[in-house]
């Protein structure tokens, strides 16, 4: 049996770790990053995965797949899929055999299932871990959101198998977060934990009880369609509205501009966490009705972003209150609050 790794297969980023004598250690990928971007792009009859795919996204927006986790275990008949199609630049469709109980994406004119795309990401994580560890990696524990359906869990397991891994266990992300952040489950006295996990594409809120080395989920709530991507969209919508107003141009059909905008919105969002203002600069990708080149140079304030974000934050608060109510607890009953997630 080869080495065992733990994988956080995220909507936006994925992380690999291993446990040894020195405890849990995150494994860097071949790009010397602790996080691998959950992005796959078609390039010259092959695939780029992670940062290389992300860097080429503006050049090949229709052949670059992001946020595939949101499509795992879904079907073309799911009502939420229509809104997802509008927010992504690559094609999302039912398989060519006409089955509405499945879904696929297209890259370079070929169809791929979400399981196949996820398997490509997992394969890179496996290969990079083997490179870093110097040993074969054969087994993995993979995390999924607490509210994932059995169909979505099965799809994740299938992706792991396609990547050449023996999936030892699928573990829910809140429990994994509690373990990873060192909350001591060995205490004999029962403790309650509220895990608030706002990821790139999904939101999870879970109430856990820990005692004598064991965790139990008292209640879980979540929103598959609420995450960092939605906060990015606030900034993207602001830029699109400004471009329409200032230049009389709708940039939505310019896929190269929109891909670049998505990358710039993430940078702006992160900048606004520590600065009162951020600048979005995208030169030369748009033209006006006279075919003159347009440069987009806009500022967005933290106050504007915070105000527009309030409805999204309110959703997470409402789900948190619902989870506490279902668990028959109040905030005074919570011993630990763990806030997890990134970007």
Question: What are these regions, as identified by a protein language model?
Answer:
Residues 1-86, 91-99, 106-120, 127-343:
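Oxyanion-binding/catalytic loops of NTP- or PPi-dependent enzymes
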């Amino acid at each position: 049996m080869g080495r065992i790794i733990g994988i956080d297969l995220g909507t936006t980023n994925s992380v690999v770790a291993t446990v040894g004598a020195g405890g849990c250690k995150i494994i860097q990928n071949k790009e010397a990053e602790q996080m691998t971007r959950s992005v796959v792009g078609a390039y010259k009859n092959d695939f780029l995965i992670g940062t290389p795919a992300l860097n080429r996204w503006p050049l090949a927006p229709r052949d670059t797949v992001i946020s595939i986790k949101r499509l795992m275990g879904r079907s073309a008949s799911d009502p939420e899929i229509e809104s997802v199609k509008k927010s992504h630049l690559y094609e999302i469709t039912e398989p060519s055999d006409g089955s509405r109980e499945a879904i696929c994406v297209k890259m370079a004119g070929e169809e791929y299932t979400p399981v196949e795309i996820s398997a490509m990401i997992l394969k890179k994580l496996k290969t990079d871990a083997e490179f870093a560890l110097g040993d074969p990696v054969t087994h993995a524990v993979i995390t999924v959101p607490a509210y994932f359906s059995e169909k979505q869990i099965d799809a994740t397991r299938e992706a792991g198998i396609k990547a050449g891994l023996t999936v030892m266990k699928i573990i829910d992300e809140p429990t994994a977060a509690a373990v990873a952040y060192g909350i001591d489950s060995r205490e004999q006295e029962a403790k309650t934990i509220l895990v608030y996990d706002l990821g790139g594409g999904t939101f999870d809120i879970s109430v856990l009880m820990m005692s004598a080395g064991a965790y139990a989920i008292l209640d879980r709530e979540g929103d598959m369609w609420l995450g960092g991507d939605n906060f990015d969209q606030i900034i993207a919508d602001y830029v699109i509205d400004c471009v329409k107003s200032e230049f009389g141009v709708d940039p939505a059909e310019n896929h190269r501009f929109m891909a670049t905008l998505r990358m710039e919105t993430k940078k702006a969002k992160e900048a606004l966490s520590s600065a009162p203002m951020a600048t979005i600069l995208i030169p030369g990708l748009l033209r006006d009705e006279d075919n003159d080149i347009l440069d987009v140079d806009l500022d967005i304030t933290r106050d504007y972003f915070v105000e527009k974000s309030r409805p999204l934050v309110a959703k997470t608060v409402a789900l948190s209150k619902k989870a506490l109510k279902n668990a028959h607890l109040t905030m005074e009953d919570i011993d630990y609050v763990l806030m997890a997630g990134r970007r």
